[in-house]
């Protein structure tokens, strides 16, 4: 069976949590917990509350996401 593709959404960081996790509010108002992608960690891209970001979400668990880009 083929793997489901990730859902991409935009959001804004509300709060920085421990272990490079963030609370992010999506454009539709939902709040999710997100972690930084490996490439962003590798290039030392810093994120602060208020930053606009692009997220990838699994269709299986819509409460967690991966931050893939900072605008």
From Swiss-Prot:
GO CC field: cytosol
The entry's keywords: Cytoplasm, Initiation factor, Protein biosynthesis, RNA-binding, rRNA-binding
Cross-referenced CDD domains: S1_IF1
Gene3D superfamilies membership: Nucleic acid-binding proteins
Complex formation: Component of the 30S ribosomal translation pre-initiation complex which assembles on the 30S ribosome in the order IF-2 and IF-3, IF-1 and N-formylmethionyl-tRNA(fMet); mRNA recruitment can occur at any time during PIC assembly.
Family to which this protein belongs: Belongs to the IF-1 family.
Function (record text): One of the essential components for the initiation of protein synthesis. Stabilizes the binding of IF-2 and IF-3 on the 30S subunit to which N-formylmethionyl-tRNA(fMet) subsequently binds. Helps modulate mRNA selection, yielding the 30S pre-initiation complex (PIC). Upon addition of the 50S ribosomal subunit IF-1, IF-2 and IF-3 are released leaving the mature 70S translation initiation complex.
Name assigned to this protein: Translation initiation factor IF-1
Organism: Flavobacterium psychrophilum (strain ATCC 49511 / DSM 21280 / CIP 103535 / JIP02/86)
Encoding gene, per UniProt annotation: infA
